[in-house]
Amino acid sequence: ASHIHLYIEQGAQIVGAFPSATEGYDLAEPNEHTQFQDFGHSHWKNSLIWGIGLEDITISGPGLIYGKGLTREESRLPGVGNKAISLKLCKNVTLKDFSLLHCGHFGLLATGVDNLSILNVKVDTNRDGFDIDCCKNVRISHCTVNAPWDDAIVLKASYGLGYFKDTENVTISDCFVSGYDRGSVLDCTWQR
């Protein structure tokens, strides 16, 4: 639904569970264009939090989204989730003041999003922090992204929407990116 504000209070956690034999994440939706890129970039519904075609969405903190049960691998098994947040063809999205830990393949996969603000978000993960794909009017500011085994902030243009679309009008400012051990930035131990 559009016009949603998800507020994660101080000390609150949204925890991604491990799938079981009978329960799991939404299945990856069919996408005839998967041959143009890897599995993680071609599906949105197999995520802890996902939205398609939404407007006026805010997720804010200061709580934590903990992708404990998400995989960082290219799993195509039913019920396995591989992203913390996925947004496709959304407008007017604000993500601010919360933290993401162990996010699977991506902390955020934003594809075809117009008017996206990511402010003061902390990501401590083992793969990509923010993947900004086919988006326009994006502002990323005052964020911390620790991604020791992959990309911290990725800007790209792909066929994720089934057609090529540029990423345009992006501003990134006052961010800190690092490659410390997974989890050690949020717990302030800064280990390698």
Mark where each language-model region is.
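Extracellular/periplasmic carbohydrate-active domains that bind, remodel
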Residues: 1-192
